[in-house]
């Protein structure tokens, strides 16, 4: 079957992407590693000994970065619907995060010890039609925020990929009620054509009873 011009164009951009080449050189599994590295360089969100949950982890770029930064005294639980090759000292849970059974596995892995940081690079399979894609993307963001509320310790932080569009303003307003500080950034390593941004949320206020 012949490749479409669109897919061939993407492949050409991918092969020539400097971050793809750098990832291969540095031993990272994806160019996404540099988004987290850039966030880390500016904001120092990840520290040795932290307990962290990584959502939408496959192929493992963010988990690789996080595992190295938290070190042997830290703990990292990663989850994705796709398979992910193992990373030393990383607990991986494969399954659909939107299903209760998978969520229960994540909560069981976290146990009674609350976490310092939740990171999420999740995104649905994009069709290219915003009317279809945005509700799916926002649904994942809402579920990630719900989980963060359940497992973050007071003062904990949250980093999530989010797309500007319908539901964005409401989500931001909701997050501001739950965290002391919210900041939106677009890393240099994000593709210019992408609508993705990252929300950094500091200082979780704890669950209201």
Swiss-Prot record:
Annotated keywords: Cytoplasm, Methyltransferase, rRNA processing, S-adenosyl-L-methionine, Transferase
Active site per database record: 161
Nucleotidyltransferase is among the record's keywords: no
The reaction(s) this protein catalyses: uridine(2552) in 23S rRNA + S-adenosyl-L-methionine = 2'-O-methyluridine(2552) in 23S rRNA + S-adenosyl-L-homocysteine + H(+)
Binding site for S-adenosyl-L-methionine: 60, 62, 80, 96, 121
Keyword Methyltransferase: yes
Listed SUPFAM superfamilies: S-adenosyl-L-methionine-dependent methyltransferases
Entry GO MF terms: rRNA (uridine-2'-O-)-methyltransferase activity
Subcellular location: Cytoplasm
Gene3D superfamilies from the UniProt entry: Vaccinia Virus protein VP39 (3.40.50.150)
GO cellular component, one term: cytoplasm
S-S bridge residues: none
Enzyme Commission (EC) number: 2.1.1.166
Record Pfam families: FtsJ (PF01728)
Function comment: Specifically methylates the uridine in position 2552 of 23S rRNA at the 2'-O position of the ribose in the fully assembled 50S ribosomal subunit.
Similarity comment: family membership: Belongs to the class I-like SAM-binding methyltransferase superfamily. RNA methyltransferase RlmE family.
Protein's name according to its UniProt entry: Ribosomal RNA large subunit methyltransferase E
Biological source species: Pseudomonas fluorescens (strain Pf0-1)
Higher taxonomy: Bacteria, Pseudomonadati, Pseudomonadota, Gammaproteobacteria, Pseudomonadales
